[in-house]
Amino acid sequence: MTKVADLSHIRELMKKRKERANEFNSIKHVDLQDNGTRNSPIKQFLLQKAWKYVIIAAWFVASLFFFGYLLNRGNTDLTKEMSPASLPVICVRENGHDFNRMFGYTTEMDYSVIRDGITPLQTGRKLNVRVYKMGEKINNISYELRSIDKERFVEEGDVTTYTQTSEYMDLSFTFKDIISEKTDYSLKIILTLENDRKAYYYARIFEDDTLNFSEKLDYVYYFNDCTFDKETAQDEIGKYMESNSSGDNTNFSHVNIHSSMDQVTWGSLEVKRVDEPVCTVGEIDSKNALMKLEYTVSALTGEEERLYSVTEYYRFIKGSDRMYLLSFDRYMNTILYADKGVVYKDKLMLGIMPSDFEHAESKDGNTYAFVNNNALFVVNSEQNTFGTAYSFYDKDNDDDRCLNPDHDIKIVSIDESGNVIFYTYGYFNRGDYEGKCGIHLFEYNSKTNVVEEKLFIECDKPYEIIKEDLEKLAYANLLGEFYFYFDQKIYKANIAEQQIETIVENLNNENLYVCANNSMCAWVSKEDSIGVLQMTFLRMDTSERYTIDAKGGERIKALGFMGEDLIYGDAKIDDIYENVYGEKIVPMYNLNIINKFKEILKKYSEENIYVTGCRINDNLITLMRDTKDENGSLVSAPPDSIVNSLMEKTYKNNSEVIATENLKKIVQVTLKREMDNKKIKFKTPKTEMYEGKREVLLNTDSENIFYAYSLNECLGEFTDLSKAIKTADENYGTVIDCDGHYAWKKETYASTNQIMKIVETSEINDDTSSLERCIETILEYEGFSLDVKKNLSEGMNPGDIIEKNVPYSKGLDLKNSSSDEIKYYLNKDIPVIAMAGDNTVLVVGYSDKVYVWLNPRSGNLMKVNVDEAETFYENNGYHFVTYMKWDS
């Protein structure tokens, strides 16, 4: 049966072959005289075959279009462009000028720490504001006035009287006379928009009729006007400048008071203002003022016109006859777009901008990413592409809201495929999170040209506070985890599960050490009154952690990271001591450099040499060293250095500053390979969205934190008030606590002041310490009578005793603070304890020549020469105890 089946199968095949042969034979015997006319069998055959292929090809092409349509229709659901800005803008008005511009929030914020400028009220507690509608319909305007810490309600109401045009509404507030002079209050303005959307605007207002505010505001606007007119400038503002050889006249990115008049008036640049400057008032009193102007200019270079953002800082005082300029700084930064004007062969001509800017490259150097003016750009020289990966502004979205600089972008990593992981943080100018503050993590896919949203973490703190913490630590790994430092805590966000957990809390930023690329960190995890017993080391790329413990009879101290390697030292307990300023000195007899695997790469020790600190600069460690003399006392020894030759990094794409004719110095990047200018693809990606939200809320609970501010910029976050004051003092700034109360302020103090309510007392007996009497005198001055001996014996410190008994106050312990800095409190009739053991005194007044002390032992008031007092303060470490107060 099998053979029969095989034969029949063969016969069938032979039959088919014969039929095919006959078919071709018929073609062979055709009369060729037809010459391929319509009736030609060859042509008919070929046409039949051709039509079959045409039909198949047509079906294939139609299928491609059909499936492409389906795919594109699906992508429309998955990706979208960033929606335009939709919130109105509010400015305070004075003498025809806009100042202290407010951008709207779509959620309520912790406004006690928002310092977007301070706003003086006009005479009679009046405030004029202008609401720029920006094309939005405003259904209602209301307001709420509270104490700066939000605890006390002052007044609220709806705004029903205003004048308006198609573009703006002018409002006027007159507040009740229950507000106190020279006291800050928080004003919240609420706009109700269409669909019952609410936008919140915050201002810090105060009443003080001694400021000459209108005159000072006119001064900065007039100064700015003059810089655009060379002839007028020489006569009108030349007298304010201090032009000398220290001024850099080769670079427009930073111009200062020492620059030449030609440089201040824009040199040979054809510059035009494209919008009106808006002023932010940072600090102001009867004499001093600190103000900032922000605006945009255009400049023509050859045939090309570019836009630039400009920020000017003015610090000046009002004299009896005129203003005196103490400092002037102008910063200029190119507003870039991903277009042909930037790329030329292997060069990126970035233009006038800071030379120190955020940038990164892939390992092979084919992909290069950089940040300019809060926008992220990605160049792929291999694929010949250049695009804006993320930006709130573009050529269709370029108003004040889109150019608001209150956010930053940081690049985390770039892989070999050119995909960029990055995050942006601060205030979101437009898009799905418009009007919110937080941290937004993304991945840019270079092949699909799509920005994928990973996670949005919302918080109620303003940009300046977020920036201060995130610049210490933020890192995303390949495990779908995002680590960041905020509010004295390290958090880990699980991207897939949209959850946040706390890794460590109550972590003073001075006890946190982070490597340059943010992938490693270490912190103090166990300590006692002597020093550090244990540190924890965390690899955020793998989420592994381990501890480093001190040996018996020793303590350890971290000095920082060199690359990804941690440097820490070992010290004997007997060698650790406090200096006169209360600073702990840890002389380390041995240094260790360990890698991420906890392997010791190097030890450093020399006989009778103790390392007390170091400076780390790239791959160079400079060691500060002491040695013991014949008496066993530590004395200074020559410094030493350690070089890590393996850490030197070379880039395949290199930035440099070059000189040009009109623009002077500009920033240029030389790419790994040359790009074809005729074939460059300029990309503008869309954002990939997901069903549901990729948003989590971060609950914050700041305590015992002080913020140093200058203008509206946060200079640092501190748990040590003395360091916060020193930072603010150097920058003509202010220190506030986490509730927004002033802890210290650089201002004009009265030349002399004495707290007259504090009078001489009886001398103390041997059972009473001078510190007890000083504290009791303060409490009596504040209207309370208390024996503090028990409190002190129970271990309470003086500041805590004052804070516990004086309402609406906070005790302050200041170490290594200058005598000038304590005048802030004395000027406000707040006494200051000068700590000196049994010789502690209470400072109650000052003048140019003397300080007034209450000597608690004798009970007498005494005038002490300034030099003598200075020596006393210095010998006791400039250690003071005082307190801050605020209205109930």
Task: Give, region by region, the residue ranges found by the protein language model.
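Short loop/turn segments that connect beta-strands within beta-propeller blades
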Residues: S381-N384, K447, N494-Q498, R539-T542, ...
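Beta-propeller blade signature
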Residues: G435-N449, M535-D541, E583-K598
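Core segments of small alpha/beta cavity-forming domains
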Residues: E81-V154, L187-E270, V343-F386, S391-D394, ...
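Surface-exposed, charged secondary-structure patches
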Residues: W59, L71-N75, S112-N128, N140-S166, ...
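Beta-propeller fold detector
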Residues: E155-G157, F328, F386-K395, V450-C459, ...
